[in-house]
Structures are given as structure tokens and as C-alpha cells.
């Protein structure tokens, strides 16, 4: 077994209560999540069926599960590894009997949006990328629980956006279809309306681990908080310095305010970068240090030798 550094070992051995792990690239965060999951089962006596490990992409969830099975020498595990959409859709399937036929395809989604744009948007229908832009804004509104009257569109007049948004929601509901954001939204509404169902899933997922936490949006966070009650065995892993998906609705301030929401949360920084040279790490820390809304960190690397960092200037982002 690979020997872990003190910060990694502290995170792995954390059993109960909230913890925030600040983990930059090359810090071994995936290994920490995998080994902590195994530690909870083998050393903490926690039932694997009560553990939820959730991340943002199917590829990441698949890799996490495969690494856990390899680490434990198993071919199967009752631990739930999944994405937010996959886990929450599974909850909806049990509650409402949804099937794959209820999932809105991209073709259907953009067909609805193009038709609504023709009805309400006039000349906007001639802009080839408009359906993608308004789909992104609809996702932001849903994912962050923004009241429609308080959202100001950047891709069309506000009244046009509201008409298209309402028309899109009505079209999905009349067809009994869910888009990806509805999987999250409907799960939130289900838990708010049905405390008995929420309590059943709280008993199921008594220990929750969330990877890439800096990319979470408000709705996802609200559901995670509901699920984690009453024990609040919530273990979040992320890097506030890598939050780049604000345009998709990510709310990096959620991570920055985590200890406000959970005053008793422990915080661990995985402070050794095993991937970069000393030159790269020093340059990166100098640049990101200009960001004032971040957790201050002191990172080191055993890889001190490397090429000097080059600075190049280009005329455009492409």
C-alpha cells in the first residue's frame, strides 16, 4: 500500500461529521476519496450500502468506482458511485416510475427551443448559436433557483427569455419529459414535498462524499444538504482555484462559505503537489494569488527540477 502524507492520511481517517478537503491538481484527491471510502467500511464498520460517492461526470464516477474495486480487490460493491444527475434520476425513477422514454433528447430540446424562438424571438431565430445560448441560460436559472423575474438574459430581451423559458417548461411538462436540469429540480421538489421519501433516502445515504465540489450549483447543494441531515456526514473535496464553470451555473462561493454553513467542519489541505515541477507550482501560485476570493494555501512539491516557465502572448484566444 502506498504511504500517504499526513494531510492525506488525516482526510482518509475522518469518519464522521462534515469535512472540507482542499485538493489541487496532482495532490492525490481521487486516491484519498477511494481510500477513505474503504477506511470507513473496514475500520469504521460503516455499511457500504450507506455510502454515496458523487461527482459531475460519468467518466469520473466510473473511474472512481473502478479504482475502489481495484483497491479493495472486489468485483462488486454496494457503495453508490454516480453523478448528480444519475443519482437523483434514480430517486425519481423510484418515486414516479420514470423510464428512459421520459428523458428529453437534445434533438427534442433544441427543436422545442427553435420553435419557441420563431414564435417569440423574431430575428433571433436566424442566429445559429442562439438555441445553445438560451439553453445554457435556462439551465442556470433552474440550477440556481433564480426567480424568473429576477433573471436578466445576456442573449435576448428579458421578456423574450421569460416567454421562451415558460414555453419550454410547459412543452416538457405536457410531453412528460425531463431534461438534465429537471432531474435535479424535480428531486429537490420531491424532497421538499415528501418528507417521508426524504427520510428514507437520508437513512440510505448516511455518508456522502462529493468530488469537484467547486463546480456545484445551488440546487445540487441544497439537495446534498437535505440528504446529509441529521448527522451531516458530508465530506467535500474540491479546489476553489479551479472553479471555471460559473457560466454553466457553478457557484464557487458555496465552497468558500462551506464552513459558515457547517461551523463544526474540519478543513484539510492536500498541500503536496506530486505532478508539477517547483517552477510550475511557484508560477501558478503567484498568478492565482492575485485572486482575493480564495482559500490561502501553501503548497510544495517533491519535483523541484524542471524547465523554466515560458510566457507567450497571442493575438486572440484561439
What are the residue ranges of the model-derived segments?
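Conserved helicase NTPase motor core
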Residues: 1-13, 17-21, 52, 60, ...
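P-loop NTPase Walker
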Residues: 1-99, 199, 253, 282-285
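ATP-hydrolysis module of ASCE/P-loop NTPase motor domains
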Residues: 15, 76-78, 96-182, 205, ...
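Helicase P-loop NTPase motor core
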Residues: 25-33, 263-266, 271-318
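Conserved catalytic network of the ASCE P-loop NTPase/AAA+ motor domain
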Residues: 43-48, 72-74, 200-201, 216, ...
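Switch/connector loops and helix/strand junctions flanking conserved nucleotide-binding motifs
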Residues: 60-64, 87-92, 243-246, 276-282, ...
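Conserved AAA+ ATPase "sensor/coupling" helix adjacent to the nucleotide-binding pocket
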Residues: 68, 115-119, 283-291
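Proline-centered turn/helix-capping motifs that create local helix->coil transitions or kinks
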Residues: 126, 143-146, 231-232, 287-297
